[in-house]
Amino acid sequence: MSGNVASRFTDFRTSDGEKAWRHRDNEFEPATLTRAQLLQQWESAWAVMFREITALADDALSETVTIRGQAFRIDEALLRSLAHSAYHVGQIVYIAKAIRAADWQCLSIPKGMSEEYDRTASRENAAAHAAWLASRNQGSRGV
C-alpha cells in the first residue's frame, strides 16, 4: 500500500499518479522487513498524502489529476484512493485475525457485545468508547 499511496500523492496535481520510480511489480515479491522498516514505509507514504490533501482548497476538488494516463477530478481521485486503501486494509485485518487467532483484539465492538454496547452511553463519548472497548478486549477475542 505504501508504494501506491506514495506514488499517487507525490506531486499528484502536476504529474501522473503512476510514477516511474514505483516499480509496482516488486511490491508483490516476498520481502523481509523489520517492524520499524515497515512502519517507516507506511508513515512516510501517508505523510505524503496528508501533506498534499492538507494543501488543497475546497475549490481545487473539481480540478483534474491524471492517474495512469486517465483524467480524474481530484474529489474522484481521492474517493478512488480511499476505496483502494480500504480494500487493502480489509485484507490486512483479515490476515492479522487469522494469524493472531485467539490473541486478536477487536478493533471495534467485539462479537456478542453489541447489545451491551448499545445499552451504554459510552458510544456518545470518544474517550468513554475507547475505555469501553479496552475493557471488553481484555477478556474477549472479538472480531
Please give the residue ranges for each predicted region.
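Short, helix-capping/interhelical loops that line the mouth of catalytic, cofactor-
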Residues: 2-52, 59-65, 98-143
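A contiguous, mid-protein "functional segment" used to position or interact
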Residues: 74-112
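Active-site-proximal inter-transmembrane loops
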Residues: 67-74
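Generic short alpha-helical hydrophobic face used as a protein-protein interaction/packing hotspot
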Residues: 1-2, 92
